UniProtKB/Swiss-Prot annotation:
Gene name of the record: ectP
Entry keyword set: Amino-acid transport, Cell membrane, Ion transport, Membrane, Sodium, Sodium transport, Stress response, Symport, Transmembrane, Transmembrane helix, Transport
Protein name: Ectoine/glycine betaine/proline transporter EctP
Family indicated by similarity: Belongs to the BCCT transporter (TC 2.A.15) family.
Transmembrane segments annotated in the record for this chain: 24-44, 62-82, 102-122, 156-176, 207-227, 240-260, 275-295, 329-349, 360-380, 417-437, 463-483, 489-509
GO cellular component: plasma membrane
Catalytic temperature dependence: Optimum temperature is 25 degrees Celsius (irrespective of the state of osmotic stimulation).
One Gene Ontology molecular-function label: symporter activity
Subcellular location, record wording: Cell membrane
Membrane topology: Multi-pass membrane protein
Annotated segments matching region Disordered: 524-562, 589-615
């Protein structure tokens, strides 16, 4: 895959400082992150209280908006998928995909939510089975377990990827179709026009960088907690702040090395290795655990997901059956995903050039969702089986005591080769977060520069370091409630970008409508009354419009256009038979514009054979 992308940058010369990054975008975004880190560490518990109050208000009053908004995006994307715009390519019309389907899937998955599945694979189903989301079933009953998996599939299935697919599709379209700079502001060019290069557009790019940094920082924070828990199980490493900060430092350092290597050498290699390792771990659980039960449940899982999704995607707990549950889980997930969706969207757009809109939507929504269902049906059901055979083994530490990061390693204790497999799982988690950080660093650099690989390596390394710094600061201020703090901050940061997504849908549809050519109406054979075998045979033997008697497509004349969009046919045109024209015939095409509605366009009704036209 070539790392050179044909992208037109904004019409600006070098800035006075000689920096490749835009000074406004760079200084505002980095300045905000630095001030946040310093203020968060300095204020400590006061910052924690402030985050909690703001996030609490958003969850209490606007949770319904997140639920309905994400479902609206899903419906919008399905409409685009089924429409004529589905055939449009993310790039020039003759571009081909740069990656095979398997490599494409590995990269978008590893750079997306792969690390999150490692964290929640066991923990989420057991949480929901114990504390039933709708509070209408007995804890750990069969019905409660089914509902638990329905919600888990909902959280990590199509809807999570819907949030990332919208900016990904929008970025891919405007960057590779319209050749605009690789910035989030480019998506809004049909609305803002030239202002994407001035303050309004740059503020959007600042929002994208800040959202990406905080979204990935939350993911890294959760991963660090899980890595620390795994090290505690294996080597009795203390679960304290200084150990977690050391883990962040090491992961960030390795991510800096990877990001300095670029997309092909670093991220692509790590992504492929990581997916292979994750699949190997999944097969280990499948074949060394209750294999038959897991296989049966794997099949059932797709039915559970399909039957529950229409209800869950619109459920907002209006009767307050389980107050606070949806804010803690569903709304947090949507806010978290929205927060880092510019990064995943830009990354997925970068690796999807040459694919059609329909391929993009279908692939980005279906492939990771299918893998997610398989993953949770195996890891989640394995955890449920461990709990059912030994009540309290998982629910007590994971749900009651809140030690969510250790859930996976607690299950691995019940499997053979515990030490080796747990260490193997740790490596997978670490690599997942390395790929997330270096992917985000590359994307942040593109948002800041408006081009790819136009800055020194130190810039991309700096972006990786900012992610580590934010994750570290959030864990420092409240080590005892690290997950809660991470959740609260991401809910606050995500809200502005959530509103931006509604505008993004309008802008994308407007841009596609402006760029796409009209689609011809379907044409069929014209039948006369068929009341004898001879007429049936005669009419059945006629070729369809545009095809010869042998079923081969007839050639189409190549149509050229002048600068005003008028069709230009060089040479003579031979027409056999009568020609009817509705409207006036003019010698000068410019006169046609003055004639207004009296000027008609004669549309070709079918392709003509070479014998029927001469150009």
């Amino acid at each position: 895959m070539s790392s050179n992308i044909a992208i037109t940058t904004e019409p600006e010369g070098k800035n006075k400082k000689g920096l490749k990054s835009d000074p406004f975008i760079f200084s505002i975004s980095v300045g905000f992150i630095v001030v946040f880190v310093i203020a968060t560490i300095a204020l400590g518990e006061k910052a924690r209280t402030t985050f909690s109050a703001i996030a609490g208000w958003l969850l209490e009053n606007l949770g319904w908006m997140y639920i309905g908004g994400v479902s609206l995006v899903f419906i919008f994307l399905m409409g685009i998928f089924a429409s004529r715009y589905g055939r449009v390519k993310l790039g020039d019309d003759d571009d081909d995909p740069e990656h095979t389907l398997i490599v494409w899937f590995c990269m978008l998955f590893a750079g997306g939510v792969g690390a999150v599945l490692m964290f929640w694979g066991v923990a989420e189903p057991i949480n929901h089975a114990f504390n039933v989301p709708m509070a209408n079933e007995e804890s750990m009953s069969e019905a409660a377990i089914v509902q638990a998996f329905a919600y888990t599939f909902y959280h990590f299935g199509i809807h999570m990827w819907v949030i990332m697919a919208l900016p990904g599709l929008s970025l891919g379209y405007f960057i590779y179709k319209r050749k605009l700079p690789p910035r989030l502001s480019s998506v809004f060019s049909p609305i803002l026009g030239k202002h994407i290069y001035s303050t309004p557009g740059k503020l959007i790019d600042v929002l994208a960088i800040v959202g990406t940094t905080f979204g990935i920082a939350v993911s890294v924070g959760l991963g660090v907690l899980q890595i620390n828990a795994g090290m505690n199980k294996l080597w009795s490493t203390p679960q304290v702040s200084w150990v977690q900060l050391l883990i962040i430092l090491i992961i960030t350092a390795v991510a800096c090395i990877s990001v300095a290597s670029g997309l092909d050498k670093g991220i692509k290699l790590l992504s492929n290795i990581n997916i292979a390792m994750a699949v190997a771990l999944m097969f280990f659980i499948l074949f060394t655990g209750p294999t038959l039960t897991l296989l049966r449940f794997l099949v059932e899982s797709f039915g559970i997901y399909a039957s529950w999704m229409p209800n869950l995607m619109f459920w907002t707990d209006s009767f307050q059956d389980n107050p606070g549950w949806q804010g803690k889980w569903t709304v947090f997930y949507w806010a978290w995903t929205i927060c880092w969706s510019p990064y995943v969207g830009m990354f997925v757009a970068r690796i999807s050039r040459g694919r059609t809109v329909r391929e993009f939507i279908g692939g980005v929504l279906a492939l990771p969702a299918i893998f997610g269902v398989v993953w949770f049906s195996i890891f989640g059901r394995a955890g449920i089986e461990v709990e059912l055979s030994n009540p309290g083994f998982l629910t007590q530490p994971t749900v009651v005591e809140g030690d969510v990061p250790a859930a996976l390693f607690n299950v691995l204790q019940e499997y053979p080769l515990t030490g080796i497999v747990s260490a193997f799982a740790l490596v997978i988690i670490v690599i997942f977060f390395i790929t997330s950080i270096d992917s985000a660093a590359l994307v942040n650099d593109m948002f800041a520069t408006g081009a790819e690989n136009q800055t020194p390596t130190s810039y991309r390394v700096m972006w990786a370091c900012t992610i580590g710094a934010v994750a570290g600061s959030l864990l420092i201020i409240s080590p005892s409630s690290g997950i809660a703090t991470l959740q609260e901050v991401v809910i606050i940061v995500a809200f502005p970008f959530f509103l931006v997504q509604f505008v993004m849908m309008f802008s994308l549809l407007k841009g596609m409508s402006e760029d796409a050519a009209a689609v011809r109406r379907v044409q069929t054979r014209q039948w006369e009354k068929t009341d004898t075998p001879e007429k049936l045979e005669e009419h059945s033997s006629q070729p369809a419009p545009g095809y010869d008697d042998e079923g081969n497509p007839l050639p189409m004349p190549a149509l050229e256009h002048d600068e005003d969009g008028n069709i230009v046919i060089p040479g003579n045109v031979v027409i056999e038979g009568d020609l009817g024209v509705v409207g006036d015939v003019v010698d000068d095409p410019e006169e046609a514009q003055e004639m207004g509605s009296r000027f008609k366009i004669v549309e070709q009704t079918r392709p003509q054979s070479r014998d029927e036209y001469d150009i």
